[in-house]
């Protein structure tokens, strides 16, 4: 017996390994067919029987009723296989009407619209004509010269009717041949000799130098090669015969009232048949040419409408003016075959109902209404009733169940025992949206859900509904129990943190329980056991908040119990009792006021040290305790709890005075409108924060009172600080001031809302506020869709990313260090490397001991060693550098975040990555409005303070001392580092050009000491020498103009876009410095002291004045800032993963070198970089209005910005390489999510980046058959090169290219997956021509063909089956 049969027989429809798609030849279409459809009739209106030779003909397609011919001569099974001589129908099952096809012999050839109109048009590419021209021939507008003969006409030249007539008159009737219609196109395609054409194109490609031509040739060559490889004939793109799909797939259904509902396809087929028959008649009766031609054109249009209605010309519409649904429409879009029926099927054995809280349940249980369970488990109940002899037949069992006999309930209890059910809440944004539970039968009609799983489902109990699904087979039950049971999904796959965390009221209850108050009854009493304390509490000697001393036995590291005396409260001890005993989980972790964060950390600890079971029990008990005390605390709040601070009016008055001063400065012309705007917004931001801080102080410490019933802590404060509900943002609006609001375009309104909700808003404030809130609401609605679309694109690009082996053996890795922004460590190194594997052996920098072996997983214990060693950067393995050919290896991926262990083979990490990135997107967009449009804008940073006691190190220090003896930074890339005693970097700050340095290299500084300060709203231009100012090229009204401010009447000189000056001379406004002799001063780098001024710069000096070193000669105002919230964020994430060019993108230097400004060209500035080794210099042309961040003579490094903005990803890849690119994308995406407090592991983003970097572009074909400019898969490229080297040929060269996720999805190796994503017709057209083969490697294509996905258990079955086949072959 063969081994492979052990794994169960594959059904007939599943015995294939790959799927190939081709163009069908006319003979193939005829071979599928069971007969020609010649009549447009469908069924007889009286007898309702199909008409003979019509679209539903029983002779062609099979009998209407099982085993019964049409005329009724043969009935019953016994006549199976007989063909009735009277009506010609074969006696068989009526199911064949779903399989049998027919055909229509067309009277004239017709072009297939997909190959004609689907861009790029294949027919026109092959014939080397424009699509417009091909259409003119096909639709009988123009003739084409097939054979010029004796005339001087060109082959392939188009002629109108008149031109043809003229040519005939000129050269004679038979001098040349010109023809029209699909026949001529078919003939021209037939005549193509591919091998010859390929050679010609190849030679032309070698000789041509034009880039445009090259691109065109490569496209044509690719198409020719596709045809050669697939053995498709080009003339098959023109059809002589049309397939008719089986009638059951385009049904005609009778409605009550004698009317019929029919599929649109029947109508479209009828039009084709009618026109075809008419054409046949016309040809037979030798009708005039013009009539025949018109009929042929109409036939072409009818076939076009059948295949793809509306693609060309006006769509064919039905009586109600609704376009017919053609064959293409059946496949396309959300309602098409792929997405509606193949990827998303409806499921039987399912029910749905409203959910309610099941606080008495255990984590692995859910309450299922009895009625629902009875319906869902029917088949199981029937079989059990029969098995026990309670019912004799299935019918009897059915009756018993319908009557709801008492014994049925007993059987139901037994059937349900340990049979898990799946609960799902839509939208299912990540895999935790479907989990398995064991059902408990309950009365009522609502499903009961365990409260702690709400976070994973994002469910609340305000009327949410959930669906129940029943896993039927034993394998399905097993998978549900092992993989999907809620107890096995404690950690979130997105970030590895517990997702079963108490929330809302539970958190509030636990916070209340762990509060400790001063001066409570019985403070300082000593206890040694809990019973004693309970007694004291019962008799009111203490309260749960009294500070007491307690002797507690604790496990030490050796595993012995040691008594320790701790200061605590009874409430905290109650939580402490629930902790599992483990030396790593000390009482100190909960001996504090427990907030949501603390509870989460404790649950994490328990999971890491005590395992899953202990965690589940601990979380469950915490929940019960939290609910109990949330109830008995009786926390509520009223108006008095919203405290308005006394100092509010003082702060507001101060700010108003400040703003008056800004207005004054503005009216005196000292600052521009933009600067004033920024300063005003900033001042109000600070004021709002100050008011909020004062309010927080007042709320946090309620007034002291002798009243024993006095509230010791503010309820609102408690809710916010514990993390139960609300944020300080919202409390600020209740009791402080609402602060600044945004306009609908995202700009901040200068006048803030001074009132809060307690005092109430004025009419004007209310209007502004409503405006901001409305924006939030609209954003929410719009962003939900775009976020869902982003998730879909991400899943599609990453769906075939699966762990396929343990170790790929690569030595490569990426270097990571902690993320430092504004001198603060935002993401410590520890967080970035936890759960990754080391790429090299890692040693202690001082003692040189080995900390980690290469390829070893970095777990919590190793982290502590790395942190104590003070390492600040580490090489880790990454999916970006993994060298597995299919999929990714476990070692490069690292820890599976949902289990905390090394990822196992077969895990679908691509989908998990996509869900982890996409899910919070939707979450966040649903949450923009919680702040209600209040602007959240931090005041601009204008100085740097030391965050530690440390030593200063300054990188690229270029400083001048100005007239006030201040140190002014002149370098564009100055950085200030703070180092600890070992010389490790603790913080890093970028110091902008023009800042005042308050410390110097090598200084020791103390914490909070100011290091540097600057004006955040303008970019200054500063002199580095003293001298006399000379204005150059500043022509009033042309390159410079006095801008008189309307409000103040004060003129200031501003550089404007220079218009054409006399005789096209370019104006380049600049300031030169002259010495006493009137000559231009030379700078330290040998260049002359010239300062070019960009458009928009405001001059700070007059012509001819004397200035000294470090003075500001002009200011460039910065744009005023708009608010940041995730709506800015989601499009940013999409922009990154789609690899789009950002609007106003930066320009980056490709080499190290010195900057020089060349001669301007029209509206562009020319920046030239001269490398040090004086090789080729590189020029950049940039628009004049853009702000150039470098000065003439500056030295730039490769990758530095020349122009401000977000860099283009493709540039980063080209200049800096994959690692820098990956770091940049990860950093940017993380910044968006971090703003919202969402944590996603870096590796998920890396998986997506890996998928974006799958293709290479050939730069030099070497000795291979590849073409320069062709884009192919990375692994394919490596295989081709290996072959070339084996055969002694020169290998090809290529460069990695970055593709956006949509493009990458459409170019996957699997055409089925690509077709089901987007642009279905285009993908299928392309695949059919190339005769593509789908190896069915990814998840989507397997779902579509109805198999188990090759991930998880399916992956192992696949693996075992392959091994079994191998064994069988060996045995044979």
Swiss-Prot record:
For molecular function, the Gene Ontology terms on record are:
DNA binding; DNA-directed RNA polymerase activity; magnesium ion binding; zinc ion binding
Residues reported in the UniProt entry to bind Zn(2+) 1 = 69, 71, 84, 87
Catalytic activity, EC: 2.7.7.6
Q: How is the cofactor bound?
A: Binds 1 Mg(2+) ion per subunit.
Q: Name one GO biological process term.
A: DNA-templated transcription
Query: What are the entry keywords?
Result: DNA-directed RNA polymerase, Magnesium, Metal-binding, Nucleotidyltransferase, Transcription, Transferase, Zinc
Q: List the disulfide bonds.
A: none
An annotated GO cellular component of this protein is:
DNA-directed RNA polymerase complex
Q: Which residues bind Zn(2+) 2?
A: 808, 882, 889, 892
Query: Which reaction equations make up its catalytic activity?
Result: RNA(n) + a ribonucleoside 5'-triphosphate = RNA(n+1) + diphosphate
What broad class of enzyme is this?
Answer: transferase
Instruction: Kindly give the CDD domains that the UniProt entry links to this protein.
Output: RNAP_beta'_C (cd02655), RNAP_beta'_N (cd01609)
Which co-factor is required?
Answer: Mg(2+); Zn(2+)
Q: Where does Mg(2+) bind?
A: 460, 462, 464
Q: Name the PANTHER family on file.
A: DNA-DIRECTED RNA POLYMERASE, DNA-DIRECTED RNA POLYMERASE SUBUNIT BETA
Q: Which family does it belong to?
A: Belongs to the RNA polymerase beta' chain family.
Q: What does this protein do?
A: DNA-dependent RNA polymerase catalyzes the transcription of DNA into RNA using the four ribonucleoside triphosphates as substrates.
Q: HAMAP family, from UniProt?
A: RNApol_bact_RpoC
Q: How does it assemble?
A: The RNAP catalytic core consists of 2 alpha, 1 beta, 1 beta' and 1 omega subunit. When a sigma factor is associated with the core the holoenzyme is formed, which can initiate transcription.
The molecule here is called DNA-directed RNA polymerase subunit beta'
Native organism: Rickettsia felis (strain ATCC VR-1525 / URRWXCal2)
Classification lineage: Bacteria, Pseudomonadati, Pseudomonadota, Alphaproteobacteria, Rickettsiales
Instruction: Please name the gene that encodes this protein.
Output: rpoC
């Amino acid at each position: 017996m063969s081994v492979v049969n052990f794994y169960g027989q594959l059904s007939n429809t599943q015995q294939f390994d790959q799927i190939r798609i081709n163009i069908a030849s006319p003979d193939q279409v005829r071979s599928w067919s069971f007969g020609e459809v010649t009549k447009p009739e469908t069924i007889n209106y009286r007898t309702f029987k199909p008409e003979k030779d019509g679209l539903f003909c029983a002779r062609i397609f099979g009998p209407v009723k099982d085993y019964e011919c049409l005329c009724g001569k043969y009935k019953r099974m016994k006549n199976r296989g007989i063909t009735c001589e009277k009506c010609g129908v074969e006696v068989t099952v009526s199911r064949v009407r779903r399989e049998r096809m027919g055909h229509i012999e067309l009277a004239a050839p017709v072009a297939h619209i997909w190959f004609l109109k689907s861009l790029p048009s294949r027919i026109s590419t092959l014939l080397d004509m424009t699509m417009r021209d091909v259409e003119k021939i096909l639709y009988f507008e123009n003739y084409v010269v097939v054979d010029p003969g004796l005339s001087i006409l060109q082959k392939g030249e188009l002629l109108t009717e008149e031109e043809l007539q003229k040519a005939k008159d000129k050269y004679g009737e038979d001098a040349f041949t010109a023809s029209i219609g699909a026949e001529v196109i078919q003939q021209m395609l037939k005549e193509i000799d591919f091998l010859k054409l390929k050679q010609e194109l190849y030679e032309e490609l070698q000789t041509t130098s034009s880039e445009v031509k090259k691109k065109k040739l490569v496209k044509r060559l690719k198409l020719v090669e596709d045809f050669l490889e697939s053995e498709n004939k080009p003339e098959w793109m023109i059809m002589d015969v049309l397939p008719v799909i089986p009638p059951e797939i385009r049904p005609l259904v009778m409605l009550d009232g004698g009317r019929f509902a029919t599929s649109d396809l029947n109508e479209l087929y009828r039009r084709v048949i009618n026109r075809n028959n008419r054409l046949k008649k016309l040809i037979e009766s030798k009708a005039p040419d013009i009539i025949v031609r018109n009929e042929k054109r109409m036939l072409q249009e009818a076939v076009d409408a059948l295949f793809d209605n509306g693609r060309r010309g006006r769509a064919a519409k039905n009586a109600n003016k609704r376009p017919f649904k053609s064959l293409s429409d059946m496949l396309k879009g959300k309602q098409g075959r792929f997405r509606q029926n193949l990827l998303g099927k409806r499921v039987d054995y399912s029910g749905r109902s409203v959910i309610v809280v099941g606080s008495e349940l255990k984590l692995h249980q859910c309450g299922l209404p009895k009625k629902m369970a009875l319906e869902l488990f029917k088949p199981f109940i029937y079989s059990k009733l029969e098995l026990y002899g309670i019912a004799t037949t299935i019918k009897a069992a059915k009756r018993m169940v319908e009557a709801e006999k008492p014994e049925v309930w007993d059987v139901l209890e037994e059937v349900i025992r340990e049979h898990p059910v799946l609960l799902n809440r839509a939208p299912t944004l990540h895999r935790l949206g479907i989990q398995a539970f064991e059902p408990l039968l309950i009365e009522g009609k609502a499903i009961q859900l365990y409260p702690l799983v709400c976070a994973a489902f994002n469910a609340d109990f305000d009327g949410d509904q959930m669906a129940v699904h029943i896993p039927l087979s034993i394998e399905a039950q097993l998978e549900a129990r092992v993989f999907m049971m809620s107890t096995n999904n404690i950690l979130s796959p997105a970030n590895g943190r517990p997702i079963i965390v108490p929330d809302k009221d539970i958190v509030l209850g636990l916070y209340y329980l762990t509060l400790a108050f001063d001066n409570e009854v019985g403070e300082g009493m000593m206890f040694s056991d809990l019973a004693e304390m309970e007694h004291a509490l019962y008799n009111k000697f203490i309260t749960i908040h009294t500070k007491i001393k307690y002797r507690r036995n604790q496990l030490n590291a050796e595993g012995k119990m040691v008594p320790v005396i701790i200061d605590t409260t009874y409430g905290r001890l109650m939580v402490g009792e629930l902790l599992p005993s483990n030396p790593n989980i000390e009482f100190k972790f909960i001996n504090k006021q427990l907030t949501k964060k603390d509870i989460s950390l404790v649950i994490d600890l328990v999971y890491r040290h005590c395992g899953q079971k202990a965690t589940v029990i601990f979380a469950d008990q915490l929940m019960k305790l939290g609910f109990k005390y949330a109830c008995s605390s009786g926390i509520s709040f009223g108006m008095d709890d919203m405290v308005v601070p006394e100092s509010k009016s003082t702060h507001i008055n101060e700010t108003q005075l400040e703003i008056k001063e800004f207005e004054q400065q503005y009216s005196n012309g000292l600052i521009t409108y933009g600067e004033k705007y920024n300063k005003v917004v900033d001042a109000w931001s600070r004021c709002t924060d100050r008011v909020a801080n004062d309010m927080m102080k007042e709320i946090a410490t309620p007034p002291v009172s002798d009243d024993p019933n006095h509230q010791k802590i503010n309820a609102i404060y408690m809710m916010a600080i514990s993390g139960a509900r609300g944020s300080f943002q919202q409390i600020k609006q209740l009791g402080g001031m609402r602060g600044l609001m945004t306009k609908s375009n995202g700009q901040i309104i200068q006048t803030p809302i001074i009132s809060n909700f307690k005092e109430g808003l004025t009419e004007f404030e209310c209007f502004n506020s409503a405006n901001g809130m409305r924006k939030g609401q609209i954003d929410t609605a719009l962003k939900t869709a775009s976020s869902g679309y982003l998730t879909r694109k991400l899943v599609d690009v990453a769906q075939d990313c699966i762990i396929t082996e343990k170790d790929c053996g690569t030595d490569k890795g990426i270097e990571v260090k902690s993320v430092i922004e504004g001198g603060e460590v935002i993401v410590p190194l520890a967080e970035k490397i936890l759960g990754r594997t080391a790429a090299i052996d890692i040693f202690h920098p001082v003692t040189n001991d080995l900390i980690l072996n290469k390829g070893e997983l970095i777990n919590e214990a190793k982290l502590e060693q790395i942190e104590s060693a003070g390492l600040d950067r580490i090489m880790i393995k990454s999916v970006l550098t993994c060298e597995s050919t299919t999929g990714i290896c476990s070692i490069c991926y690292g820890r599976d975040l949902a289990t905390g262990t090394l990822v196992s083979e077969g895990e679908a990490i691509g989908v998990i990555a996509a869900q982890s990135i996409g899910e919070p997107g939707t979450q966040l967009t649903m949450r923009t409005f919680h702040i209600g449009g209040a602007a959240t804008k931090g005041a601009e940073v204008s100085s740097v303070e030391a965050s530690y006691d440390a030593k200063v190190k300054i990188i690229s220090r270029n400083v001048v001392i100005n007239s006030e003896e201040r140190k002014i930074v002149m370098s564009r890339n100055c950085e200030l580092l703070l180092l600890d005693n070992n010389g490790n970097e603790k913080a890093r700050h970028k110091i902008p050009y023009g800042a005042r340095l308050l410390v110097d290299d090598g200084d020791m500084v103390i914490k909070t000491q100011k290091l540097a300060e600057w004006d955040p709203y303008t970019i200054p231009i500063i002199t580095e020498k003293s001298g006399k100012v000379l204005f150059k090229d500043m022509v009033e009204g042309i390159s410079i103009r006095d801008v008189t401010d309307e409000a103040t009447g004060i003129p200031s000189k501003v550089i404007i876009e220079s218009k054409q000056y006399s005789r096209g001379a370019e104006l380049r406004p600049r300031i030169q410095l002259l010495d006493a002799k009137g000559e231009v001063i030379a700078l330290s780098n040998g260049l002359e002291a010239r300062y070019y001024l960009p458009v928009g710069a405001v001059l700070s000096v007059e012509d001819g004045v004397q200035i000294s070193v470090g003075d500001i000669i002009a200011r460039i105002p910065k744009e005023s800032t708009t608010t940041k919230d995730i709506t800015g964020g989601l499009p940013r994430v999409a922009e990154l993963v789609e690899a789009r060019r950002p609007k106003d993108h930066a320009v980056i230097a490709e080499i190290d070198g010195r900057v020089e400004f060349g001669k301007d060209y029209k509206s562009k500035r020319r920046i030239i970089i001269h490398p040090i080794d004086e090789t080729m210099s590189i020029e950049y042309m940039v628009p004049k209005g853009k702000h150039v961040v470098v000065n003439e003579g500056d030295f730039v490094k490769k990758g530095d910005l020349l122009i401000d903005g977000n860099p283009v990803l493709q540039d980063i890849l080209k200049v800096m390489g994959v690692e820098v690119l990956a770091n940049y994308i990860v950093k940017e995406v993380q910044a968006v999510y971090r703003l919202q407090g969402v944590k996603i592991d870096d590796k998920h983003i890396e998986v997506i980046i890996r998928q974006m970097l799958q293709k290479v572009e050939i730069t030099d074909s070497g000795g291979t058959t590849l073409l320069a400019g062709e884009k192919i898969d990375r692994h394919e490229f490596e295989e081709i090169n290996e072959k070339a080297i084996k055969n002694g040929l020169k290998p090809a060269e290529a460069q990695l290219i970055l593709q956006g996720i949509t493009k990458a999805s459409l170019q996957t190796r699997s055409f089925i997956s690509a077709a089901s994503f987007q642009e279905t017709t285009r993908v299928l057209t392309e695949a059919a021509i190339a005769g593509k083969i789908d190896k069915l490697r990814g998840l989507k294509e397997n779902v579509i063909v109805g198999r188990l996905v090759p991930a998880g258990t399916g992956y192992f079955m696949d693996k075992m089956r392959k091994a079994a086949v191998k064994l069988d072959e060996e045995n044979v």
